[in-house]
Amino acid sequence: MYQPDFPTVPFRLGLYPVVDSVAWIERLLEAGVRTIQLRIKDKRDEEVEADVIAAIALGRRYNARLFINDYWRLAIKHRAYGVHLGQEDLETTDLKAIQAAGLRLGVSTHNDMEIDVALAAKPSYIALGHVFPTQTKQMPSAPQGLAQLASHIERLADYPTVAIGGISLERAPAVLATGVGSIAVVSAITQAADWREATAELLAIAGVGDE
């Protein structure tokens, strides 16, 4: 039963690019994306604050769902749409502060045990990964594959879910066929020969999400 402690999100968030710069945020919002995440790693808050401010402003301009990865204090301070946290961040984050600020929360998971941890936090959505091998970041866990993803989707029922990890244009239809609400992509867009074409094709498959 989907009863999060944080504001709800649509079951279908649509195509959900995860990018590391404001430039990518802007060009993808201009291209029609309406759910997006800014993920800048391993910098101090003061080093990324200007980027967070700019990304949130763009999200508002395009009426988009803009999630900030990890930098939850800045997301609260500048009132982002939401925050995305990894498992390792849950214990060190003031979830009640995020909740009190009215921000949505997404949480990464990689197996059933981590799904249990995520469900205990009652986030707005749960990310499931990595589905396929990925070069975007080092992963300690093995790829889950489509059968395991489908099993997680069945377990989570009406909970909004996002599949992530090695999802290409060619693989996207099979991933969505598991019943997952949304697909997060990184290199399928940022490393595409023509990112505009790749984005348009992925939007045609995954949509922009429900209101």
Curated annotation (Swiss-Prot):
Enzyme class at the top of the EC tree:
transferase
Domain of life, per UniProt, equals Bacteria
Q: What Enzyme Commission number(s) apply to this enzyme?
A: 2.5.1.3
Which keywords annotate this record?
A: Magnesium, Metal-binding, Thiamine biosynthesis, Transferase
Cofactor: bound how, per the entry note? Binds 1 Mg(2+) ion per subunit.
Entry's Gene Ontology BP terms: thiamine biosynthetic process; thiamine diphosphate biosynthetic process
Is Metal-binding set as a keyword in this record? yes
**Positions bound to Mg(2+):** D70, D89
The entry marks the following residues as binding 2-[(2R,5Z)-2-carboxy-4-methylthiazol-5(2H)-ylidene]ethyl phosphate, namely: T134, Q135, T136, G166, V186, S187
The terms under GO molecular function for this entry are: magnesium ion binding; thiamine-phosphate diphosphorylase activity
Which transformation does this protein catalyse, written as a reaction? 2-[(2R,5Z)-2-carboxy-4-methylthiazol-5(2H)-ylidene]ethyl phosphate + 4-amino-2-methyl-5-(diphosphooxymethyl)pyrimidine + 2 H(+) = thiamine phosphate + CO2 + diphosphate; 2-(2-carboxy-4-methylthiazol-5-yl)ethyl phosphate + 4-amino-2-methyl-5-(diphosphooxymethyl)pyrimidine + 2 H(+) = thiamine phosphate + CO2 + diphosphate; 4-methyl-5-(2-phosphooxyethyl)-thiazole + 4-amino-2-methyl-5-(diphosphooxymethyl)pyrimidine + H(+) = thiamine phosphate + diphosphate
Sites where the protein binds 4-amino-2-methyl-5-(diphosphooxymethyl)pyrimidine: Q37, L38, R39, I40, K41, N69, S108, K137
Pathway given for this chain reads:
Cofactor biosynthesis; thiamine diphosphate biosynthesis; thiamine phosphate from 4-amino-2-methyl-5-diphosphomethylpyrimidine and 4-methyl-5-(2-phosphoethyl)-thiazole: step 1/1
Q: To which protein family does this belong?
A: Belongs to the thiamine-phosphate synthase family.
The UniProt function text for this chain reads:
Condenses 4-methyl-5-(beta-hydroxyethyl)thiazole monophosphate (THZ-P) and 2-methyl-4-amino-5-hydroxymethyl pyrimidine pyrophosphate (HMP-PP) to form thiamine monophosphate (TMP).
Write the protein's name: Thiamine-phosphate synthase
User: Taxonomically, what lineage is the organism?
Assistant: Bacteria, Pseudomonadati, Pseudomonadota, Gammaproteobacteria, Enterobacterales
